[in-house]
């Protein structure tokens, strides 16, 4: 029975430019058995093409169709939601701009003209950018969309601030929750990947990642099998703290090759999914 595997990248497949031991072998193992493997990252500072090149360089076979990042999800969402004449003001890096432009999203540098504000990870984030976004929201009732909810991103030197920092800044000044957060664990992202890319039923899909509040939460809410790996952000202690329970907990992705549920033709459940 064909299965779909949705792998996170940072903290799951690699850390920075260092492949996590057993990752390439695990992906090969699954691909050679006819399973559909895709990669889904919330990181918004690199393009999908960048990820194809990086994974290929690290010895993992993949192509553009099997790479999803939060920029791509955001662009697809906006393409469905925006009228052709509407404009977006973007706080983010070049990779986010590129993805939005590929989907035909019109971008303005003048926040006063914006119908939508897009927040992404921005390592040149300034008070002025925050002020412009706030003014567009206050004066134009612009909708606020964030690429992803992650507070931090794992790196070899430890976690660093991610898009969640920008969300916090905007919510701090506006006093409201922003309108939409894309990437994991959004319903839109899940539908896009499961129904339109993998084209499988949720129960045929496994999401593999190192974050409880994004990877595992997404799987639990939308009926996917969940595999938490302990090579990134989350720990056994985090599970107790958050109350988010993965279906499987593995030291790293290489242990997937020993799971009878994966290697056997018939999948047997080893625990209940938690809603």
What would you call each of these model-derived segments?
Residues 1-7, 15-21, 25-33, 45, ...:
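Asp-based, Mg2+/Mn2+-dependent phosphohydrolase catalytic module
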Residues 42:
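A metal-dependent hydrolase metal-coordination microenvironment
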